Curated annotation (Swiss-Prot):
PANTHER family: 1-D-DEOXYXYLULOSE 5-PHOSPHATE SYNTHASE-RELATED, 1-DEOXY-D-XYLULOSE-5-PHOSPHATE SYNTHASE, CHLOROPLASTIC
Family: Belongs to the transketolase family. DXPS subfamily.
Catalyzed reaction equations: D-glyceraldehyde 3-phosphate + pyruvate + H(+) = 1-deoxy-D-xylulose 5-phosphate + CO2
Encoding gene, per UniProt annotation: dxs
InterPro entries named among the record's database cross-references: Dxylulose-5-P_synthase, THDP-binding, Transketo_C/PFOR_II, Transketolase-like_Pyr-bd, Transketolase_BS, Transketolase_C, Transketolase_CS
Name of the protein: 1-deoxy-D-xylulose-5-phosphate synthase
Source species taxonomy: Bacteria, Pseudomonadati, Pseudomonadota, Gammaproteobacteria, Enterobacterales
Pathway terms, separated by semicolons: Metabolic intermediate biosynthesis; 1-deoxy-D-xylulose 5-phosphate biosynthesis; 1-deoxy-D-xylulose 5-phosphate from D-glyceraldehyde 3-phosphate and pyruvate: step 1/1
Amino acid sequence: MSFDIAKYPTLALVDSTQELRLLPKESLPKLCDELRRYLLDSVSRSSGHFASGLGTVELTVALHYVYNTPFDRLIWDVGHQAYPHKILTGRRDKIGTIRQKGGLHPFPWRGESEYDVLSVGHSSTSISAGIGVAIAAAKEDKQRRAVCVIGDGAITAGMAFEAMNHAGDIKPDLLVVLNDNEMSISENVGALNNHLAQLLSGKLYSTLREGGKKVFSGVPPIKELLKRTEEHIKGMVVPGTLFEELGFNYIGPVDGHDVLGLVSTLKNMRDLKGPQFLHIMTKKGRGYEPAEKDPITFHAVPKFDHTSGVLPKSSGGLPSYSKIFGDWLCETAAKDNKLMAITPAMREGSGMVEFSKKFPDRYFDVAIAEQHAVTFAAGLAIGDYKPVVAIYSTFLQRAYDQVIHDVAIQKLPVLFTIDRAGIVGADGQTHQGAFDLSFLRCIPDMVVMTPSDENECRQMLYTGYHYSDGPCAVRYPRGSGTGATLEPLASLPIGKGVVKRQGEKIAILNFGTLLPEAAAVADKLNATLVDMRFVKPLDTALILQLAGEHDALVTLEENAIMGGAGSGVNEVLMAHRRAVPVLNIGLPDYFIPQGTQEEIRADLGLDAAGIEAKIRDWLA
């Protein structure tokens, strides 16, 4: 879409933060209004993360107005809320390409702009990076400021508290802004807090506070009285005791939609020394009523007509793998009251909404705490319950030590249901599920299964749930099934594959949901086709049989080639001294950027035509 200057006259003046800082302060509310409308118009046409950005318009404008970005470092946590930041930092006219192949990255990305200090996508990393940036600036004596913006969800993660604990110890010059959009404040309390925030962030208060500490430091009773008086004054309206105890100077909560008030408070705070904490209250979806009423649904949106306020419904075709999992979970829980389901803040995405309503006493959303989720599951297993950890492939990476140390070493029967495995699509490098087979396959006593369709997925979930000799993992992709008939549930023989087609000379060993593409190629090449089903334990006998009956083997998986299922096949052949040529097809050795799943698979040669071409080129 082209930028309409007449529709956004103030925003038209701002294509960089230098231009933003030339505006008179009185024009900032109008700029915020235009920025919010432009964001609504753009994202509704292109798709993308939506409600979070609507809630951070005023904060974004105020931060770039007060701080000398990009010299001063502004770090966004996760990045869902950073679309206004992109618009104000030279990417206004490209915002309609966000999350698309060759377009703007869905999150702040270092390779895209000097304003994007830290590439993000996963949560709770900003404060740690901010401390490092602040310490580096102090070492170089550059008078550079560091600011981190973190949401009320991300700050619940342990990594954020680890960082704040460290900051309280080493006292870097750092501002942490908590964007709190989970609760509202009344006008009276809000006005009082806004006034108090400007008072407490002012130089006079800061000078008196530090001066008083020095003067009365040798008089313990008076020093204690001053401390208690300050705590009582702040405690009347401030919920910041925790952050004060961690060593931060806490200011807030303040109205995050009052851009002029934010500018005043941030100007006061900019030159304060040591770790500072600004708590702002915002409304997710601000300015667009449907998103304000239902911020979860409008968190990320497809293309839609924003004048109607209605998102397009799904075509109602084949069920997604997430729904297949959710249905199995409810079905199993109805028969077994030992089942306990755990998710780290991914209820909707993992297909657990219905389960959470039907079995609330057995549903545990542990928030953004993947490490805790896994060890919590270990404890449930020790207590003779049957935990199911529903987690995205990319987020399981964050709990790798817990999978090994707290579950696998102890052979605890925990079932990991790994959603978004393989190519995810529009969220790009940080969200592709490229590595789970590689990092799980090397763990002793771990069973790893790769279903080829929704029926096999159900059978594997059943198999893993009833397996008692250690942990199991079932990995499945984002997207819909194939329309396979759902058969009665039964346990599969552990570590056994199935020959789907008998051919000659070449055998294709498929791991996962690329089976339809593999079948099309096998028909063209008259190749044997095998649904391997298990990455660990591998069907060694079948691999050796195929090696003896064919001139060459081809392995196929939607996981990194390095260390993946194909590597396991290679290891079997080498261990048994079978000198048969093997072609490993999978994800290449680089981080895969955004695009649709179809676009990415075509680019990587993982559609039927690409797989056939790879095999023919290899055989030539």
